[in-house]
């Protein structure tokens, strides 16, 4: 199903379930105080620049998005404030299909959820705090750079399935991987910043 937005819409809530693919495209935008909720095994692709201020919640399946900005700035996943409850990881895969960017958005990791950076030439720098009890997995062909030693606030494991995970400073490397300090490497590459100017790489 392809939804073409040619104007601004302000629903109370957006809920997408099922096993198919729903793609939201066009020059319009999702605005207002709406929340976007994704369940079911299918895919929801958000390809519009949205300004809704409610939370984005993924329970199951794939939520595909092509832009990511700081909190309160419009993006494919809205313009919610920089609070953990505004971006919920409760299962499934967040699939980022855009280019290099950075964000200070915080998130709540409730259960194992994957963040996939699709493009090999894309780097996403995370400057927010992720908290919660769930596991967080990284995958794809691109790179996630951790820009703050407060990012790993969640209690679950960090799982690297693909792509690159870059701990960009010595302080971040020393802070550990999640409050459980449990790292599971299934694939991909881990880069850590040492006391010298270089990086240690593990794969």
Residue ranges and their predicted role:
Residues 1-45, 53-124, 129-145, 153-203:
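Beta-strand repeat architectures
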């Amino acid at each position: 199903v392809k939804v073409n937005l040619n104007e601004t819409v302000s629903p109370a809530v957006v809920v997408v379930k099922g096993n198919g693919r729903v793609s939201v495209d066009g020059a319009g935008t999702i605005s207002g105080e709406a929340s976007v909720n994704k369940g079911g095994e299918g895919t929801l692709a958000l390809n519009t620049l949205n300004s809704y201020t409610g939370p984005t919640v993924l329970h199951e399946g794939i939520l595909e998005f092509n832009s990511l900005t700081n909190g309160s700035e419009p993006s494919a996943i809205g313009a919610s404030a920089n609070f953990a409850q505004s971006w919920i990881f409760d299962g499934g895969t967040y699939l980022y299909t855009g280019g290099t960017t950075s964000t200070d958005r915080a998130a709540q990791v409730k259960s194992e959820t994957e963040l996939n950076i699709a493009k090999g030439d894309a780097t996403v720098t995370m400057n927010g705090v992720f908290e919660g009890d769930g596991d967080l997995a990284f995958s794809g062909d691109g790179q996630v750079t951790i820009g703050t030693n407060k990012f790993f606030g969640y209690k679950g494991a960090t799982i690297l399935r693909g792509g690159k995970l870059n701990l960009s400073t010595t302080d971040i490397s020393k802070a550990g991987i999640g409050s459980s300090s449990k790292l599971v490497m299934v694939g991909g590459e881990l880069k850590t910043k040492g006391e010298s100017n270089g990086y240690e790489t593990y794969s």
